[in-house]
């Protein structure tokens, strides 16, 4: 079986263990891997772009060598002194294909992030935003987060990700049919034999947000976003010179107990998968409520979306 070439990125930076351990595990399975990640941590950067300054770009050959297991599969690692979305744009539409012609990605994986990306987190997260950016460019995408700060053991998150990548690989062609969106908003179907939801994923109009709990029970649930509220989210401080500074970071996080949501799944030890629309609903490529509901239908045995 030919393994899909993969684009990996994140918001924790090129040296983060979640990214490197995942890249190594995927390389072991034979996936050609192209990593382009921020040089420095870019957590909570959202969809920020670097527009006024040049960004340093470099290859990390020794780093790639240190994690490469499968000598027959390509693995190249680059960093960009920019944001996660900058990295995706450079990878897909910035001429990187001239530097790495041997790796043409079929799927983008953003992560594995340290910390949860649940509920409202998706709007701030650089990890989620990188996956969304790739999908906007027509590349099928997923993002993965370890939903805790209490440890950095990514073994469960990697196992879950490998299971999902294996399932997704059965659906995706080697060559993404809508990469760079050559027909703009006109392409509605990549394959008329597939369902509307499957086509939406292939075209980059739906992407998957995955969270794995602190201790995983080995099961997956396909669920909605939950209701998560950050309270006392800023802290004001002053010094003897009457200079005032603010620090943003919630002192209290409240999660509502709503069934079939990512917050509750994670609390109960399940990994959560939430299909997300890439575009606002009012956009020409925005998804109908019916299609989003279909995207949330799941296989009772596996917990995965039933359309995968």
Annotate each PLM feature:
Residues 2-9, 16-102:
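A cross-family phosphate/adenosyl-ligand binding-site feature
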Residues 9, 36-38, 110-113, 143-145, ...:
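Short beta-strand segments
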Residues 25, 130-135:
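Hydrophobic/aromatic ligand-binding patch that stacks against planar heteroaromatic rings
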Residues 41, 83-84, 113-116, 215, ...:
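Short glycine-rich anion-binding loops that position phosphate/pyrophosphate groups of nucleotides
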Residues 106-107:
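Conserved acidic residues
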Residues 116-125:
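Glycine/threonine-rich flexible loop motifs
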Residues 121, 135-157:
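Glycine-rich phosphate/pyrophosphate-binding loops
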Residues 156-308:
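Electrostatically charged, flexible surface regions
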